[in-house]
Amino acid sequence: MNKNICIVYTHHKLGDLIWQLPYIKAISEHYNQSVDLILREKTQAKKILKNEKYINNINYNNFRKGIFYWIDVFKLVQIYNQNKYSHVYILDKVNKPAIAGKISGIKNIIGPGIGNQKKYLTTDIILNDNDWKLNYSEQSKKLLKLHKINLNNPYPQLNINIKEFNEINSDLLYKGKKIAFGVDSFEDYKMWYEEDFVKLAELLHKKNIFDYIYLICGPDKSHITKKIIEISKKDYFIDCSKKDLTGVITAIKNSQFYVGNNSGPLNLSAALGIESFGLIVNDAISELKYSKIQFITPKNYKDNTWIRDRKNMKTLTPDEVFNFLKDKMR
Protein backbone atom coordinates (compact mmCIF):
# COMPACT_ATOMS: atom_id res chain seq x y z
CA MET A 1 0.00 0.00 0.00
CA ASN A 2 1.30 3.45 -0.94
CA LYS A 3 1.77 5.78 1.98
CA ASN A 4 0.45 9.34 1.93
CA ILE A 5 1.86 11.38 4.80
CA CYS A 6 0.43 14.53 6.39
CA ILE A 7 2.06 16.52 9.19
CA VAL A 8 0.01 18.98 11.26
CA TYR A 9 1.39 21.81 13.37
CA THR A 10 -1.09 24.22 14.93
CA HIS A 11 0.98 27.06 16.42
CA HIS A 12 0.93 30.43 14.70
CA LYS A 13 4.40 31.76 15.53
CA LEU A 14 6.94 31.72 12.70
CA GLY A 15 9.81 30.86 15.04
CA ASP A 16 7.98 27.83 16.41
CA LEU A 17 7.34 26.54 12.88
CA ILE A 18 11.00 26.98 11.95
CA TRP A 19 12.00 24.87 14.97
CA GLN A 20 9.80 22.05 13.62
CA LEU A 21 11.37 21.93 10.15
CA PRO A 22 14.10 19.39 11.06
CA TYR A 23 11.43 17.01 12.40
CA ILE A 24 9.22 17.46 9.35
CA LYS A 25 12.21 16.71 7.13
CA ALA A 26 13.12 13.66 9.25
CA ILE A 27 9.63 12.19 8.79
CA SER A 28 9.92 12.78 5.03
CA GLU A 29 13.32 11.04 4.96
CA HIS A 30 11.98 8.15 7.05
CA TYR A 31 9.35 7.37 4.41
CA ASN A 32 11.58 8.45 1.50
CA GLN A 33 8.91 10.75 0.09
CA SER A 34 7.71 14.32 0.33
CA VAL A 35 4.97 15.15 2.83
CA ASP A 36 1.95 17.44 3.04
CA LEU A 37 1.59 20.04 5.78
CA ILE A 38 -1.40 21.60 7.51
CA LEU A 39 -0.47 24.87 9.22
CA ARG A 40 -1.93 28.20 10.25
CA GLU A 41 -2.16 30.80 7.49
CA LYS A 42 -0.45 33.35 9.75
CA THR A 43 2.84 31.46 9.31
CA GLN A 44 2.87 32.42 5.59
CA ALA A 45 4.37 28.96 5.07
CA LYS A 46 3.37 28.76 1.39
CA LYS A 47 5.71 31.68 0.70
CA ILE A 48 8.72 30.51 2.69
CA LEU A 49 8.61 26.73 2.24
CA LYS A 50 7.82 26.41 -1.46
CA ASN A 51 11.42 25.52 -2.36
CA GLU A 52 11.73 22.69 0.17
CA LYS A 53 11.82 19.42 -1.78
CA TYR A 54 10.65 17.36 1.19
CA ILE A 55 7.34 19.28 1.25
CA ASN A 56 4.73 18.41 -1.35
CA ASN A 57 1.71 20.56 -0.52
CA ILE A 58 0.64 22.99 2.21
CA ASN A 59 -2.93 23.51 3.39
CA TYR A 60 -4.05 26.16 5.86
CA ASN A 61 -6.35 25.75 8.84
CA ASN A 62 -6.85 28.42 11.49
CA PHE A 63 -7.34 26.07 14.48
CA ARG A 64 -9.80 28.41 16.17
CA LYS A 65 -11.63 27.99 19.45
CA GLY A 66 -15.20 28.57 20.60
CA ILE A 67 -17.96 28.38 17.99
CA PHE A 68 -15.38 27.87 15.22
CA TYR A 69 -13.89 24.76 16.82
CA TRP A 70 -15.99 22.22 14.93
CA ILE A 71 -15.95 24.24 11.72
CA ASP A 72 -12.17 23.87 11.67
CA VAL A 73 -12.40 20.18 12.63
CA PHE A 74 -14.56 19.49 9.59
CA LYS A 75 -12.24 21.54 7.39
CA LEU A 76 -9.52 19.14 8.50
CA VAL A 77 -11.78 16.17 7.77
CA GLN A 78 -12.33 17.52 4.27
CA ILE A 79 -8.57 17.91 3.66
CA TYR A 80 -7.88 14.42 5.02
CA ASN A 81 -10.58 12.82 2.87
CA GLN A 82 -9.55 14.64 -0.30
CA ASN A 83 -5.96 13.45 0.06
CA LYS A 84 -6.64 9.96 1.45
CA TYR A 85 -3.81 10.12 3.97
CA SER A 86 -2.46 6.87 5.38
CA HIS A 87 -0.56 8.65 8.18
CA VAL A 88 -1.17 11.88 10.08
CA TYR A 89 1.61 13.11 12.35
CA ILE A 90 0.66 15.83 14.84
CA LEU A 91 3.62 17.78 16.23
CA ASP A 92 1.84 19.32 19.21
CA LYS A 93 -0.73 18.28 21.82
CA VAL A 94 -3.82 19.87 20.20
CA ASN A 95 -6.80 17.49 19.96
CA LYS A 96 -8.45 18.88 16.84
CA PRO A 97 -6.27 17.19 14.16
CA ALA A 98 -6.54 13.84 15.96
CA ILE A 99 -10.34 14.08 16.29
CA ALA A 100 -10.59 14.88 12.58
CA GLY A 101 -8.39 11.87 11.85
CA LYS A 102 -10.72 9.60 13.82
CA ILE A 103 -13.75 10.93 11.95
CA SER A 104 -11.95 10.36 8.63
CA GLY A 105 -10.97 6.81 9.59
CA ILE A 106 -7.25 7.39 9.15
CA LYS A 107 -5.36 4.24 10.12
CA ASN A 108 -2.27 5.90 11.59
CA ILE A 109 -2.76 8.98 13.78
CA ILE A 110 0.46 9.75 15.63
CA GLY A 111 1.13 12.56 18.09
CA PRO A 112 2.60 13.41 21.49
CA GLY A 113 -0.52 12.12 23.24
CA ILE A 114 -0.22 14.63 26.08
CA GLY A 115 -3.53 15.20 27.88
CA ASN A 116 -6.74 14.23 26.10
CA GLN A 117 -5.06 13.87 22.71
CA LYS A 118 -4.10 10.28 23.54
CA LYS A 119 -7.80 9.26 23.30
CA TYR A 120 -7.84 9.98 19.57
CA LEU A 121 -4.50 8.51 18.49
CA THR A 122 -4.12 5.07 16.94
CA THR A 123 -0.91 4.28 18.81
CA ASP A 124 0.08 3.73 22.43
CA ILE A 125 3.61 5.01 21.73
CA ILE A 126 3.29 8.48 23.22
CA LEU A 127 5.05 10.97 25.46
CA ASN A 128 4.27 10.94 29.16
CA ASP A 129 2.25 13.72 30.76
CA ASN A 130 5.36 15.23 32.37
CA ASP A 131 6.78 15.90 28.92
CA TRP A 132 4.54 18.96 28.58
CA LYS A 133 7.38 20.70 30.48
CA LEU A 134 9.66 20.15 27.48
CA ASN A 135 9.74 22.86 24.83
CA TYR A 136 8.03 22.13 21.51
CA SER A 137 11.27 21.18 19.76
CA GLU A 138 12.25 18.68 22.46
CA GLN A 139 8.76 17.16 22.44
CA SER A 140 9.00 16.54 18.69
CA LYS A 141 12.51 15.13 19.04
CA LYS A 142 11.33 12.66 21.68
CA LEU A 143 8.25 11.72 19.65
CA LEU A 144 10.39 10.83 16.63
CA LYS A 145 12.80 8.85 18.77
CA LEU A 146 9.94 6.81 20.25
CA HIS A 147 8.78 5.97 16.72
CA LYS A 148 12.33 5.10 15.61
CA ILE A 149 12.56 7.99 13.14
CA ASN A 150 16.15 9.19 12.76
CA LEU A 151 16.94 12.88 13.06
CA ASN A 152 19.97 13.48 10.84
CA ASN A 153 20.23 17.24 11.35
CA PRO A 154 18.57 19.07 14.28
CA TYR A 155 19.33 22.54 12.89
CA PRO A 156 16.59 24.34 10.90
CA GLN A 157 17.50 25.28 7.34
CA LEU A 158 15.54 27.21 4.72
CA ASN A 159 16.11 27.17 0.96
CA ILE A 160 15.03 30.43 -0.64
CA ASN A 161 15.11 31.59 -4.27
CA ILE A 162 16.52 34.99 -3.34
CA LYS A 163 16.44 36.22 -6.95
CA GLU A 164 12.66 35.86 -6.98
CA PHE A 165 12.34 37.58 -3.59
CA ASN A 166 14.62 40.43 -4.71
CA GLU A 167 12.42 41.04 -7.74
CA ILE A 168 9.30 41.20 -5.57
CA ASN A 169 10.96 43.59 -3.09
CA SER A 170 13.28 45.62 -5.31
CA ASP A 171 12.60 48.73 -3.19
CA LEU A 172 14.72 47.14 -0.43
CA LEU A 173 17.82 46.72 -2.61
CA TYR A 174 19.93 49.66 -1.48
CA LYS A 175 23.55 49.91 -2.60
CA GLY A 176 26.18 49.56 0.10
CA LYS A 177 26.71 47.47 3.22
CA LYS A 178 23.54 46.39 5.01
CA ILE A 179 22.84 44.79 8.37
CA ALA A 180 19.52 43.96 10.05
CA PHE A 181 18.07 44.72 13.48
CA GLY A 182 15.17 42.59 14.71
CA VAL A 183 13.41 45.10 16.94
CA ASP A 184 10.13 43.50 18.03
CA SER A 185 8.87 40.26 19.56
CA PHE A 186 5.51 38.62 20.18
CA GLU A 187 6.30 38.98 23.91
CA ASP A 188 7.19 42.53 24.97
CA TYR A 189 9.44 41.33 27.80
CA LYS A 190 11.89 39.97 25.20
CA MET A 191 12.32 43.34 23.47
CA TRP A 192 15.44 45.45 23.82
CA TYR A 193 14.63 49.14 24.14
CA GLU A 194 14.40 51.41 21.11
CA GLU A 195 17.01 53.86 22.38
CA ASP A 196 19.46 50.99 22.86
CA PHE A 197 19.11 49.97 19.20
CA VAL A 198 19.76 53.62 18.29
CA LYS A 199 22.91 53.72 20.43
CA LEU A 200 24.15 50.40 18.99
CA ALA A 201 23.64 51.75 15.47
CA GLU A 202 25.70 54.84 16.32
CA LEU A 203 28.55 52.72 17.68
CA LEU A 204 28.57 50.44 14.63
CA HIS A 205 28.34 53.36 12.20
CA LYS A 206 31.41 55.02 13.71
CA LYS A 207 33.33 51.87 12.76
CA ASN A 208 31.93 51.93 9.20
CA ILE A 209 30.28 48.56 9.73
CA PHE A 210 27.22 49.43 7.61
CA ASP A 211 25.66 51.94 5.26
CA TYR A 212 22.06 50.93 6.00
CA ILE A 213 20.17 49.01 8.66
CA TYR A 214 16.99 47.07 7.91
CA LEU A 215 14.56 47.37 10.83
CA ILE A 216 12.73 44.03 10.98
CA CYS A 217 9.38 44.35 12.70
CA GLY A 218 5.79 43.14 12.32
CA PRO A 219 3.08 45.57 11.16
CA ASP A 220 1.29 45.38 14.52
CA LYS A 221 4.36 46.89 16.21
CA SER A 222 5.37 49.40 13.56
CA HIS A 223 5.41 52.08 16.26
CA ILE A 224 8.74 50.58 17.39
CA THR A 225 10.48 51.25 14.08
CA LYS A 226 8.96 54.74 13.95
CA LYS A 227 10.26 55.49 17.44
CA ILE A 228 13.77 54.28 16.55
CA ILE A 229 13.84 56.49 13.45
CA GLU A 230 12.47 59.49 15.38
CA ILE A 231 15.00 59.14 18.20
CA SER A 232 17.92 58.63 15.85
CA LYS A 233 17.13 61.27 13.24
CA LYS A 234 19.45 59.34 10.91
CA ASP A 235 18.64 58.37 7.34
CA TYR A 236 20.37 54.99 7.40
CA PHE A 237 17.36 53.05 8.74
CA ILE A 238 15.12 51.10 6.33
CA ASP A 239 11.68 50.45 7.83
CA CYS A 240 10.48 46.91 6.94
CA SER A 241 7.44 46.88 9.25
CA LYS A 242 4.97 47.00 6.35
CA LYS A 243 6.62 44.13 4.48
CA ASP A 244 5.31 40.57 4.38
CA LEU A 245 7.61 37.60 4.92
CA THR A 246 9.04 37.84 1.39
CA GLY A 247 10.21 41.35 2.25
CA VAL A 248 11.59 40.32 5.62
CA ILE A 249 13.52 37.48 3.98
CA THR A 250 14.80 39.81 1.25
CA ALA A 251 16.12 42.21 3.89
CA ILE A 252 17.74 39.47 5.96
CA LYS A 253 19.35 37.72 2.97
CA ASN A 254 20.84 41.02 1.81
CA SER A 255 22.36 41.69 5.25
CA GLN A 256 25.89 40.95 6.39
CA PHE A 257 24.54 39.94 9.79
CA TYR A 258 21.43 40.13 11.96
CA VAL A 259 21.09 41.35 15.56
CA GLY A 260 17.78 41.10 17.32
CA ASN A 261 15.38 40.05 20.01
CA ASN A 262 14.45 36.44 20.66
CA SER A 263 11.64 36.17 18.12
CA GLY A 264 10.64 34.51 14.87
CA PRO A 265 12.84 36.62 12.57
CA LEU A 266 15.93 35.73 14.64
CA ASN A 267 15.21 32.03 14.08
CA LEU A 268 14.43 32.78 10.44
CA SER A 269 17.75 34.56 9.97
CA ALA A 270 19.72 31.64 11.42
CA ALA A 271 17.79 29.17 9.25
CA LEU A 272 18.63 31.29 6.18
CA GLY A 273 22.33 30.92 6.94
CA ILE A 274 22.91 34.55 7.94
CA GLU A 275 25.22 35.21 10.89
CA SER A 276 22.68 35.84 13.63
CA PHE A 277 23.08 37.36 17.09
CA GLY A 278 20.32 37.04 19.68
CA LEU A 279 19.81 39.56 22.50
CA ILE A 280 18.89 37.19 25.30
CA VAL A 281 18.18 38.50 28.80
CA ASN A 282 14.82 37.36 30.17
CA ASP A 283 14.55 33.81 28.84
CA ALA A 284 16.55 30.62 28.46
CA ILE A 285 19.22 30.10 25.82
CA SER A 286 18.93 26.36 26.48
CA GLU A 287 15.67 26.44 24.50
CA LEU A 288 17.66 27.56 21.46
CA LYS A 289 20.35 24.89 21.62
CA TYR A 290 19.44 23.42 18.22
CA SER A 291 20.25 26.69 16.52
CA LYS A 292 23.22 28.45 14.99
CA ILE A 293 22.25 31.68 16.76
CA GLN A 294 25.09 33.35 18.67
CA PHE A 295 23.85 34.58 22.03
CA ILE A 296 24.61 37.99 23.52
CA THR A 297 23.75 38.02 27.22
CA PRO A 298 24.37 40.47 30.09
CA LYS A 299 26.92 39.97 32.82
CA ASN A 300 25.85 37.47 35.48
CA TYR A 301 23.24 35.95 33.13
CA LYS A 302 21.98 32.54 34.26
CA ASP A 303 20.44 30.04 31.87
CA ASN A 304 16.86 28.81 32.39
CA THR A 305 15.92 32.33 33.44
CA TRP A 306 12.26 33.26 33.15
CA ILE A 307 11.72 36.98 33.77
CA ARG A 308 8.58 38.69 32.50
CA ASP A 309 9.66 42.31 32.96
CA ARG A 310 10.89 44.27 29.95
CA LYS A 311 12.80 46.67 32.21
CA ASN A 312 15.28 43.86 32.87
CA MET A 313 16.36 44.07 29.20
CA LYS A 314 18.24 47.20 30.27
CA THR A 315 20.82 44.97 31.97
CA LEU A 316 22.24 44.28 28.49
CA THR A 317 23.85 47.54 27.37
CA PRO A 318 24.60 48.80 23.85
CA ASP A 319 28.30 48.90 24.72
CA GLU A 320 28.26 45.22 25.71
CA VAL A 321 26.51 44.26 22.48
CA PHE A 322 28.88 46.40 20.41
CA ASN A 323 31.96 44.90 22.05
CA PHE A 324 30.64 41.37 21.45
CA LEU A 325 30.02 42.15 17.77
CA LYS A 326 33.37 43.92 17.40
CA ASP A 327 35.19 40.87 18.75
CA LYS A 328 33.34 38.62 16.28
CA MET A 329 34.31 40.82 13.35
CA ARG A 330 38.06 40.76 13.96
Question: Language-model segments: which ranges?
Answer:
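Catalytic machinery of carbohydrate-active enzymes
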Residues: 1-330
